[in-house]
Each structure stands twice: as C-alpha cells, then as structure tokens.
C-alpha cells in the first residue's frame, strides 16, 4: 500500500516541472543544498511537517531531504494544497497526505499520518509547523511523543501566538524557534508576499476591477500593510481598521483613513481581514453591506469572518465556482465570500511567489538545523525550562544575503574604521537585536 494520499498521482509530471521552475526563484534553499548537502546536518532528524503543500513547499521538503532528514508531510489548510505539487512529492517517495478541498475530518486524518510511520521506532523527533495544529495534536493528544520531540520551528503569526500562549500556561514541553519573527520572514513574506498574492487571489476568483473601489482592510500588521499597499496601487480607496494605536497611527501616516468597520460597511466594495483574530466581520455587518460586496480573509484560520452565520441565515447560497460563494441576504442583497473565509491567496490562487517563500523557507531549514544540531547540549532545554527562541541575527542576515545576487543587488563593504565607529563587526551582524526594521 502506498504511503501517501493525494488527489491524483498522475499530476506528478506536471508538478515536477513546476517545482523545477520554482527552484530557479528560490536561491536561498538551493544554496543551502550546496553548502550543507555534503555534511548532512539533518541526518537522523525525523520531521513531521504541517505546512501548505504548494510547489514552493515541495522545494523546502526536498531541501530537508537533501540535508539528511526523514520527512512526512500534511497541509495546514484544507484548501491550500496544489495537487500537482503533492503528487510530485509523493512520487519522489515522500509520504505526503494532502489534497485541495479536504473536509475537516480528512484534514485531521492527514495531520495524524505525519506522527507515525517513520523509520526506526516509527515516531517523529522534530516538528515543522504552520499555524500550530500539528504542535497542538502532539502535545495535547499524543503525550507519548513529547519526550521524543527535540524542537519545533513555527512558520506563521498564528502559530507563534499559540506557542507563547502555551508557554504562558506552562504547557510547552519542548523548545521552539519562532521563524515568523525573523526579519527575513515577517518583513518579506508577510508584507511583500501578501502585497502580490492577495490581489492575485481576488482577481482569479472574481475578475473584479479594483480601481475606484472602496476597500476595507481589517488589521495593519505586516500582512495588512502589504494588502493595503496592493489595493492602493491598483487604484482603490483603502480604509484600515485597527485596535493598536501604533499601527493605526502608521496607517494614518501612510495616508489611509482609519475607521471602524461600522463606518464603512455600507460603502465598501471589498473587505479583507488580516488580523489572525476572530469575529472581525460579523452578523452585525453583513446585512448593511452593499449588493455583491466581496468578503475575504488572508489570516491563517477561518475565524475572522462569521461564515457559519452566513450559511445559517442566508436565504440562498450559490457556489459560483470552487471557493467563490454568493449568499442572498433577507434584504435581497448579496455577499460574495471567497475561499469560504480561509486564506484567499491560497484558496483562490497559488499563494506567495517563489522568491519571497525562499526567504521564509531558508529560515525554516536553518531553524531545523539549529534545533537538531543542539539537541543534546542543553541549548534548547525541555520541560519547565523550555522556551520560544529566535534565529540569531547573523543567520537572519545570511538569509537576506543569499537572495541579493538574484535581484542584482551589491553590498557596500564597511571599512574597519567605519565598523569601529558604529561598533559592529566588519561583516556583521550589522544591527542589534532590538533594532526594528
């Protein structure tokens, strides 16, 4: 019996071509293969992975394999899998359990397949997560696995919040590296990635003309900043909602109106949630929206939009096409919901471009190497002394440096006198840890 489950294994050849194309746009991962391949720093690591099964993730998986790891994989979202990529990885011999359009039950089953079936004792000893679902499964439902896990690397804001919440409650029994807040992840993937992939998803889903429209962006963190910039670049009038006065002031200084959802719910053509919170667009808002208002989310989970209320209270629900649903309200107006309230850029398009994901995934590989290489020396302790850590600044700068040549960038070199003047090494790190980029 094949140790994988994908939509259609015959898509593997198509997926392989897409992976080869992505490799050319992912210089960080390819350089790690060249640098670390001979030394096999992940030999013996058995990584349970739960991250969007895209073409770009396929390049990550094959990089982990090239560095010696044993890997089993599932997607962290029911709609984000690219079936050609999953097929290609399965055909290459990696146990992958992912397909686009999983049910919630199938999603849970897929994740469960990644915590068994490894060589040796069959169990994983490392976790690579995006959103926290795999981490929660292991800690909450498989206590027998906890003593075997040496560490976690977490990809996204939502998953990092989960780690810190667990830590505050004394329920994080192993150390984790917060990949999300590496500068070369959050200030690139979250901002520049969303700046390109949000509109890609919206246009593939609806063919909407953005110019001249009023768009409400809920949240002005790095993701919200990228989304607002993209919509404005297409000619939209952008209104931002925020709870944090610092982010609200940033939005104001960029020229955005900062208001409440209630202030614009009757006028906005497009609503985008970016907060990672819940109950952002609610039953209080839907009845007041204009006809055919588009509502979508680019936060990790489907908690930001009250989709359940729409399904229970709409007079009619029509699926226009996969991931595009039109609800008829009691007042006769319609709401267009994209990706069923889940990640619109992955549900309705193919996610972030390969180049920016190379930044993020290079961080992931370095985090796995860091945790695995230091598993026995006490640097990342277990139990009561476990914590959430960051990659060192030198590695953050290394990730950026690996991508400069691809975009034709050249670095200026400090002289010894200049380095002494600003009190940093000639070759970096160039900024203190508290520096905010």
Curated annotation (Swiss-Prot):
Q: Which InterPro entries match?
A: Adenosylhomocyst_ase-like_sf, Adenosylhomocysteinase-like, Ado_hCys_hydrolase_NAD-bd, NAD(P)-bd_dom_sf, S-Ado-L-homoCys_hydrolase_CS
Q: Where in the cell is it found?
A: Cytoplasm
**One GO cellular component term:** cytosol
Instruction: Give the EC number(s) listed in the UniProt record.
Output: 3.13.2.1
Protein origin, superkingdom: Eukaryota
- Establish whether keyword Protease is in the entry: no
Q: Which SMART domains match?
A: AdoHcyase, AdoHcyase_NAD
Q: Which Pfam families match?
A: AdoHcyase, AdoHcyase_NAD
GO MF assignments: adenosylhomocysteinase activity
In the record's cofactor note, how is the cofactor described as bound?
Answer: Binds 1 NAD(+) per subunit.
Q: Which cofactors does this gene product need?
A: NAD(+)
Q: In which pathway does it act?
A: Amino-acid biosynthesis; L-homocysteine biosynthesis; L-homocysteine from S-adenosyl-L-homocysteine: step 1/1
Q: Which GO terms describe its biological process?
A: one-carbon metabolic process; S-adenosylmethionine cycle
Q: Reaction catalysed?
A: S-adenosyl-L-homocysteine + H2O = L-homocysteine + adenosine
Residues bound to NAD(+): 156-158, 190, 219-224, 242, 277, 298-300, 345
Residues that span the membrane, as ranges: none
Family to which this protein belongs: Belongs to the adenosylhomocysteinase family.
Subunit structure, as described in the record: Homotetramer.
Summarizing the function annotation, the protein's role is:
Adenosylhomocysteine is a competitive inhibitor of S-adenosyl-L-methionine-dependent methyl transferase reactions; therefore adenosylhomocysteinase may play a key role in the control of methylations via regulation of the intracellular concentration of adenosylhomocysteine.
Q: What is the recorded name of this protein?
A: Adenosylhomocysteinase
């Amino acid at each position: 019996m094949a140790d994988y489950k994908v939509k259609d294994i015959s898509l593997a050849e198509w997926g392989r071509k897409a992976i080869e194309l992505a490799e050319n746009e992912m210089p960080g991962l390819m350089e790690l293969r060249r640098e670390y391949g001979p030394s096999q720093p992940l030999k013996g690591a058995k990584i349970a992975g739960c991250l969007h099964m895209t073409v770009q993730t396929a390049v990550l998986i094959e990089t982990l394999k090239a560095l010696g790891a044993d890997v089993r994989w599932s997607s962290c979202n029911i709609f984000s899998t690219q079936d050609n990529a999953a097929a290609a990885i399965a055909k290459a011999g990696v146990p992958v359990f992912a397909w686009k359009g999983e049910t919630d039950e199938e999603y849970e089953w897929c994740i469960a397949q990644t915590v068994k079936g490894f060589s040796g004792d069959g169990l994983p000893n490392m976790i690579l997560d995006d959103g926290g679902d795999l981490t929660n499964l292991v800690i909450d439902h498989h206590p027998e696995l906890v003593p075997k896990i040496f560490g976690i690397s977490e990809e996204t804001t939502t998953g990092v919040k989960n780690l810190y919440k667990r830590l505050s409650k004394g329920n994080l029994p192993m150390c984790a590296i917060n990949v999300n807040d590496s500068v070369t992840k959050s200030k690139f993937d979250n901002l520049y990635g969303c700046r390109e992939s949000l509109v890609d998803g919206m246009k593939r889903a609806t063919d909407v003309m953005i110019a001249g429209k009023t768009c409400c962006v809920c949240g002005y963190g790095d993701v919200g900043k990228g989304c607002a910039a993209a919509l404005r670049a297409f000619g939209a009038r952008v209104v931002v909602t925020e709870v944090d006065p610092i982010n609200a002031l940033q939005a104001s200084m960029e020229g955005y109106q900062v208001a409440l959802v209630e202030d614009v719910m009757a006028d906005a053509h497009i609503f985008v949630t970016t907060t990672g919170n819940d109950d952002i667009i609610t039953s209080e808002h839907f009845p007041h929206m204009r006809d055919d208002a588009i509502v979508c989310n680019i936060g990790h989970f489907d908690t930001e939009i009250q989709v359940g209320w729409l399904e229970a209270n709409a007079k009619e629900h029509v699926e226009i096409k996969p991931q595009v649903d039109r609800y008829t309200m009691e007042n006769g107006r319609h709401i267009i919901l994209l990706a069923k309230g889940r990640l619109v850029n992955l549900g309705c398009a193919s996610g972030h471009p390969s180049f920016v994901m190379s930044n993020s995934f290079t961080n992931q590989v370095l985090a796995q190497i860091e945790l695995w290489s230091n598993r026995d020396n006490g640097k990342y302790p277990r139990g009561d002394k476990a914590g959430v850590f960051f990659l060192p600044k030198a590695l953050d700068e290394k990730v950026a440096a690996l991508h400069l040549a691809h975009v034709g960038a050249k670095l200026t070199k400090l002289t010894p006198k200049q380095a002494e003047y600003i009190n940093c090494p000639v070759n970096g790190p160039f900024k203190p840890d508290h520096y905010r980029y």
